[in-house]
């Protein structure tokens, strides 16, 4: 069975649309898999479905970097506030 960590997260991205999730590696290695889902969205939130999160960097053992893509404008996002859920998985090897 793999090691699995997950949680909720509120963040304002950097100017280049990147943000980090801090994790505590259970085996001293970087995560083998990581994903971020934006939402849930409250009523009146008109940006639902406008952004997707791409895993951008996992070279650090205890944090994972994501970058937001703006699906409406087909470009990387700038600074934006989001809420979402994340999951990180490490293989047991």
Language-model features, listed with the residues they occupy:
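Extracellular attachment/recognition segments
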Residues: 1-93
């Amino acid at each position: 069975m793999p090691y699995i960590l997950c949680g909720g997260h509120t963040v304002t991205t950097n100017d280049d649309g990147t943000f980090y999730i801090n994790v505590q590696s259970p085996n001293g290695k970087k995560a083998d898999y990581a994903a971020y889902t934006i939402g849930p969205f409250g009523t009146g939130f008109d940006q639902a479905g406008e952004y997707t999160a791409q895993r951008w960097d996992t070279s650090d053992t205890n944090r994972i970097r994501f970058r937001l893509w703006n699906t409406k404008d087909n470009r990387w996002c700038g600074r934006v506030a989001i809420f979402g859920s994340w999951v990180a998985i490490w293989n047991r090897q």
